[in-house]
Amino acid sequence: MDLGVAAILGVVQGISEWLPISSKTQIMLVSIWLLNASPEYAYSLGLFLEAASVLAALIYFRGVYLKALRGFVGDAEGRRWLVYILVTTLVTAVVGLPLYYVARKWLVVGHSAGFLMIVLGLAVVLNAVFLQRARFSAGLKAFDNMSLRDMAIVGIAQAVSVLPGLSRSGATVTALLLLGYKPEEAFRASFVLVPVAGLGATALAYLSEGGAVATAEALLAMAIGIVISIITIKALLEFAKSKHVVLVNVVIGLLAIAGGLLRIIF
């Protein structure tokens, strides 16, 4: 891998991780096209580069993680974040670990995952239509009132996204929007989960490839991915904070559909 390819991989990772398009799939495509890598190695490289997203999230949402730590000593808001992270992580681990090994062995599931992303995207667009007709955006849920059931659903959505072609942020943001949460709450609650899921993915990729993915060029791609990720997070959260709830749903839905189509075509 030369420095140019490393830079491209970093930019792709930094943008695609936070959009409803699978960063793993985009990294796989770039790696196969530009590096002539095997699908198995390209898949592991995509998971390894999620470390860039992990570090970017830790930097951007450091205040949230500090609150979660204070939840251990009785801070009410911190406890809500702590419970959310623990519940979703537990569910993700239970459901996601078996799926990872299945996905790595049978990468043909990518096309099926692409169809699933299209279905999810259509569901979010349909949700936007309902929002527009009902005009109940003021009654959307806030994170403070999230139930254990909703947390578990988010964990399942995150676990399923280990399959090639499925976007982690796309799956979790979609789940939260369909559960009725405000767009800004959905984006933030989804992005906050990146470190836990990403660390697990990076560790699995490193171990399964015997450390072969941790090259100097891959580390450069990771560094570039961190910078691009922070810029992308800020832009998306600002967009989600806008009052155009219906527009946010439509855009997310259309991006999910586009991501699914890309996976099916390529």
UniProtKB/Swiss-Prot annotation:
Location in or out of the cell: Cell membrane
Record keywords, A-Z: Cell membrane, Hydrolase, Membrane, Transmembrane, Transmembrane helix
Report whether Membrane shows up as a keyword of the record. Answer: yes
Q: How does it sit in the membrane?
A: Multi-pass membrane protein
GO terms (molecular function) for this protein are:
undecaprenyl-diphosphatase activity
In terms of Pfam families, this protein maps to: BacA
Q: Which reaction does it catalyse?
A: di-trans,octa-cis-undecaprenyl diphosphate + H2O = di-trans,octa-cis-undecaprenyl phosphate + phosphate + H(+)
GO CC terms on record? plasma membrane
Biological process terms from the Gene Ontology for this record are:
peptidoglycan metabolic process
The EC number(s) this enzyme carries? 3.6.1.27
In terms of HAMAP family, this protein maps to: Undec_diphosphatase
Tell me what this protein is called: Undecaprenyl-diphosphatase
Annotated organism of origin:
Pyrobaculum aerophilum (strain ATCC 51768 / DSM 7523 / JCM 9630 / CIP 104966 / NBRC 100827 / IM2)
The taxonomic lineage of its organism, from the top, reads: Archaea, Thermoproteota, Thermoprotei, Thermoproteales, Thermoproteaceae
